[in-house]
Amino acid sequence: MADFHISKVHELMMNQKNIRNISVIAHVDHGKSTLTDCLVIKAKIVSKDSGGGRYMDSREDEQQRGITIKSSAISLHFQVQKDVLEAYTKEGDTNGTEFLINLIDSPGHVDFSSEVTAALRVTDGALVVVDCVDGICVQTETVLGQAMNERIIPTLVLNKLDRAILELEYPQEKLGEVLRRRVEGFNAKLSTLGYNFKVESLLPEKNEISFCSGLQGWGFTLRQFARFYLEKFNMNGFEGERKLTNFLWSHKVSCTSDDPFDASIKHIAKPNPARSPFVVYVLNPIYKVKELCNNGKVEEIKEYLKFYKVDFKGVVLTGSGKSLFKEVMKTWLPAADCILEQIALKLPSPLQSQKLRYDYLYEGPADDEVANAIKMCDGSDEAPVSMYVSKMIPSNDNRFIAFGRVFSGKIFPGMKIRVQEPGYSPGSEELSNTSLIHNKSVLRTVVMMGRGYKDVPNCPAGNIIGIIGIDDCLKKTGTITNREAAHNIRSMKFSVSPVVKVAVSAKRPEDLGKLQEGLNKLAQSDPLCVVERNDKGQNTIACAGSLHLEICLKDLQDQYAKVPIIADDPLVTYFEGISCAVSDSKMTKSANKHNRIYMTVEPLDQNIVDNLKDVKSDQAKTMATNFREKLDIRDDWIRKIWCYAPEVNPLNLLVDGTKGISIINEIKEHVNTGFRAAVNDGPLIGEVMRGLKFELKDAVLHADAIHRGINQLLQPVKNLCKGLLLAAGPILYEPIYEVEITTPNDYSGAVTTILLSKRGTAEDFKTLPGNDTTMITGTLPVKESFTFNEDLKSGSRGKAGASMRFSHYSILPGNLEDPNSLMFKTVEAVRKLKKMNPAPPTPDSFFDRL
C-alpha cells in the first residue's frame, strides 16, 4: 500500500477529536462506491491508475453485478488545512490537522438493508448519496430513517452531475432548479423522520451539501466557488467566503449577465432562475468548460481556468469530449477534497456523538459507571470496556472476525473480557440468562482495510475495530465488557425482515454434516439471515428478499458448506395469530399426572406488538414505567409479565394471573421455557406466533419439587399454548412490500393492472417532471413478488421496473373453514412442503380433561 502506514492509523486512533466514523449510504446505483473510490485513491491506498475501480467491493459477485452486497470498512488518513479548521470549527472541537476517517461503504439494495443497520450502529455520521437526476428513492428514505433511529448525523452528496450535464444534457437553468428541488426534497423528508432525534435542515450555504460526479472524480461545495470569487467581489478571508457562499445559493437575487467575469454585471433583487447566482457563478463556468472540451480546445481551457487558479502542471490534456472533460474537472475540482471537508467539518467526532447516543445505546441505568464512560467516550485504561459487535466478518482461516465499535475503555490482545449475547441481563441467575455470558481472551485486535485487515496494538474508545478469537461464542452480535454489572448495548432494529425462506438439503447424503456446519457459518456471517431446523430434520434459510436469498444460497454452497446443495422453491415467512380470545381456562397435565396447568389467551393490542422490543424489561417497575411512558398503558397485568417471546424480537407475552400459590415462582422458568418453545413452533404451519397474550390462570402442583421439574412441565405448557391458538380463531399474517414502480406514461395502465392482479394496491400516481414517466407507489404481498419485475417488463416492453422494501405484516385473506380461501390453501400447501400432516390438528388434541 503506497504511502500508507498502519502505525499512523494507530497513532490517530488516540486523538478522539479528529476521528470521524462514517457510513456511506444511498439507494442502489446512486454512486456510493465510486465516491468511496475517490477517497481511497486520495488516501493513496490504491493508485489512481489501478484498473477496475470499486476497491471496497471485494467479492467477485459484487464486481460482476456492479452492486455492493456486504458492507466493508477502511481506515483512511487525511489532512485538512489549518486555517480552514480554525475558520469553520469551534475552538477545542479538533486537535491538529490530521484526521482518521473510519469509513464503511454499505449496500444500496433493499435486500441488504441489514448491512446498512450494522454499519450505522458503529458510526457517528452518514454521507448520504443521492442521484441528482432520480432524487430520493425508496431505499434512500429507508436508510435515512435508519440513520435517524440510530441518532446518526447526516450530510448530503448530490451525485451524478455528469449524468445530468453530459448524458441528459440539462441546460444550466434546469439543472439549477433540479438541484434546488433535490435539496428541498431531502430536507422535507428529513423533517418527517426520527421521533426522539431530529436534525436541522442541511444547507448548501453552510457547506453541508456537496455536488459531485463520483464516476468522473470531481465535485464541489459552495465554499470552493466562493473562494474563487473573493478577489472579484473585493472581499477577503473566511468572513468574505461565508458572505459569498450565502449569496451563491440565494434565489431572491438575479444577475444581469450570464458571464461571471462581465465587468458590467449587476445583481438585482428580483428572482430569475435562469440567472440565479448559482447558475451564473457556479454552473455556467462548468458548462463553459464542457463546451471547450467538446471542441477539444485544450489551450483555451487552460487560459479560461486561470481565472480559477487551476494548475495543470503534470496533467496531460488530450482528445475531446467526455474524457477531456473528466480530466479537466477532476484537476480543477477533485471530489475527494470537498467530501473530506464535509466529513471533517460537518460530521461529529466520537466525543460529540456519544453524548447524543449513550442513553439510546445503553440498556442499563443512564447514570451507572458504564453509561457515564460511554457518554464521555472514556478510552482510558481504567474505564470500563463497552464494545458492540454489529456483525461477523469471515476471515481467510475459516473463522470470523467480530467487527464493531468500542464505546468506552480500551481493548488489547490478551485482555480478559465478558462476551454477552443479546437478551442478557445482569443480576438474573436464570439458566436462560447465565448461558448468554462467555468469558474469553482477545487474541488479536485489527483494523479493517477494505479487502483485508491489519493488526494494531490496542483500540481505545471511539474507534471501529475487529477482534479475533471470540467467534465461537457469538452467533451474530453481542456486547463485550469487563464489568460484571455492565448491561448490554441495545440490539439493532432492522428495517427489513427475513420474509422469504427456502428449504435446503445436501445433494449427497454423506455431506449432511458439512451442510449443517455451513448453515451455522452462514447464519453467523449475515446480520439478518435466519437458519432453522425443524423436528422433521428440514433445514430452512430465511432472507430479506429473492436477491438476498440467491446470495446466501451461493455463499452456503461455495464458501461455507463447500458441497452441492438442493434448494426447494421459495416460500414466504408467515406468522401465526388469533382473531379472538379464549377466556375460559384450558388445561393440560404433566406426564406423571401430578401437575395441572390452566391458561387463557387473547390478542395483544397492535401498538404493544409493534413496540414490545422497546418497552420490555426484566424489572417489573421499569417495565411498568416503559409501558406508561411509551405506550400510555397502565394496566395491572404489566407488572405480572413473566416472559416475552421470541427472545430477540418479542411479539408475544406470558402473564402470571395466579393467586395464592406459594410455590408458583419455583416453576416460572419451566413454564417460560414451554411458552417460548410453543411460540417458536406454531401448530398451524410451524411458524412463529404473533400478537398473543397468554395468561397463566391456575396451577395444581405436586408438593415434591422432583415431581414438577422441567421434564414434567415443558411439554404440557407447550401443548396448552398451541391448543389455545387453535381454539382462538387462528389466522396467518403475511409479509407485505411497499412497492415503487417507474414506468413510461403510456404503460401506466398496463402496469397498474399487473399490480392489482397480484393482490397489490396502487395508492399514488406521480408524474415525474421532464421525462414522461409515472411513479406508482403501492403495496404488494411478498408471496406475489417473485416474478413481479419480469411480469412488469413483459407488460411494458422492458421499460418498467420496481423497487420493493418490506413494509408490514397483514392478515392473510380467508379462513380455515373455507377450502377455497387463500388462507386454507396456504396452510395446506405449506404443511405439505414441510412434510407435516395435511390437516392441522384440532384444539382438543392438545388439551386434557380432569
From Swiss-Prot:
Start and end of every tr-type G domain? 17-351
Q: Which Pfam families match?
A: EFG_C, EFG_III, EFG_IV, GTP_EFTU, GTP_EFTU_D2
Enumerate the SUPFAM superfamilies for this protein: EF-G C-terminal domain-like (SSF54980), P-loop containing nucleoside triphosphate hydrolases (SSF52540), Ribosomal protein S5 domain 2-like (SSF54211), Translation proteins (SSF50447)
Q: Which UniProt keywords apply?
A: Cytoplasm, Elongation factor, GTP-binding, Hydrolase, Nucleotide-binding, Protein biosynthesis, RNA-binding, rRNA-binding
Major site of localization recorded for this protein:
cytoplasm
Which residues get modified to Diphthamide? Answer: H707
The positions annotated for binding GTP are 26-33, 159-162, 213-215
Glycosyltransferase among the record's keywords? no
* Protein name (database record): Elongation factor 2
Which species is this record about? Encephalitozoon cuniculi (strain GB-M1) (Microsporidian parasite)
Gene behind this chain?
A: EFT1
